[in-house]
Amino acid sequence: MTSSAFFSRRFRYQADAVIKPSIITLLGVAFVIVAMPVCAEENPAPPAAAAGSPSAVGPAAATKAWLATVPRDKREKSDAYFEGRYWLLLWNFLLTAAICIFLLESRISARLRDFAERATKVRSLQIACYAIPYFLIVATLTFPLNLYENFLREHQYGLATQSFLPWFREQLIGFGLTIIGGTILLIALYAVFRKAPRTWWAWATAVMVIFLLGVVFIAPVFIEPLFNTYTPLMKPEISDPILAMARANQIPTGQVFEVDASRQTTRVSANVAGFLGTTRIALNDNLLKECTLPEIRAVMAHEMGHYVLNHGAKLLTYSGIFLAIGFALTRILFDAAMRRWGVRWGVRSIADPAGLPLLALIFGTLLFLATPFLNTIVRVTEREADAFGINTSREPDGMVKVALKLGAYRKLDPTPLEEFIFFDHPSGRARIRMAMDWKAANLPAGESSPLETPLPHDGH
């Protein structure tokens, strides 16, 4: 979400990482933890492997056979879609970097600062008067790429169901939330910059962590319903098994919600979100339409894993560490840039909002360069949730079939280097292999049919 607009509506089971390094990237780390609430329980121990469990074939051969069931044309289409995102990652970075440089070199940023100072003498209102036109300029200049990436291209690959006007309406809602959330954040950050010009990086980290906590708390209740309707799932044959898994893992909710995501996308998704009384289990209507009960159980157990394994708190901690390092490096680079170009750009100091494009450029560049490492952190938590999910649901074939469905828009069999750099979730191949390893080790012949080995698809 895509990366990724400010308040992403993507669920964690299929989230994408497309980074747009502007001031919005200072907010973007919230996306990783919005759907992973802060609460922890022990991970249930996997059942003991049955001695001598028969298998028709080994896990490696079964994995290869499952991958071979995907027709070549569908595989090529999926690969082309996902590999195109590698380039979009670069184009988004280059575009927003160019915008930041343009705002500095043209002194538009300095003129916005001058306008804000003429409009009011109140410091916090000056930041607001600067931030609103700044966000408007950035949104306008990035709109063509946003339109291609999130509307035209999604329709090109058959992943979107929304016509332009409803899509544009949601973009406007997202922009309004960016204005509100981004302005509040900038007011707080610039108050820190003024009061602690040398140690601002440490205090700014604390501000960002508090902001992220706020987003995690309010998103399920106040933000996500702006884009989708959540209704109680009225199918007990589906909700009862999900709630049984939730009760077994002490997840404090008594209801499952259905999300009307099919009016926007063909993707399947689900999440367990919220904390402090806002916890909610939700799955989208595409998942209900396209998946069997074993597949749904596999997905929901994975999402419960994020909750039970306390991934929200862990990722918030990792985010705090990354922010502290990023802000510390940004301070050094910002001061160096100021000594060389500050007068030319009309930027006075870190406390001057005219320096916001420089701050965004430096921090966004660091974020862009750190993409492989940030993706790895998230990918590790996703693999932990996969392990929890398969132990909880005991649905290895369901996990495999969902991985293949996600393969409609995620490359199933990337190279190790691709997976390290670009994947914030385990690849389909990795998930299928985990499921087959688990099935071979944990399901005795009396509990499950012999290791299912699909026949390769004979189409092209």
Show the residue positions of the predicted features:
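N-terminal secretory signal peptides that target proteins for export/translocation
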Residues: 1-20
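Bacterial N-terminal signal peptides
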Residues: 22-34
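N-terminal acidic, proline/glycine-rich, low-complexity intrinsically disordered segments
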Residues: 2-4, 37-43
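Helix-loop-beta hinge of the Bergerat
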Residues: 353
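C-terminal segment of classical bacterial N-terminal signal peptides
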Residues: 31-40, 217
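Cleavable N-terminal signal peptides
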Residues: 27-28, 38, 389
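Polar-ligand-bearing catalytic/cofactor-coordination segments
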Residues: 41-106, 110-350, 360-460
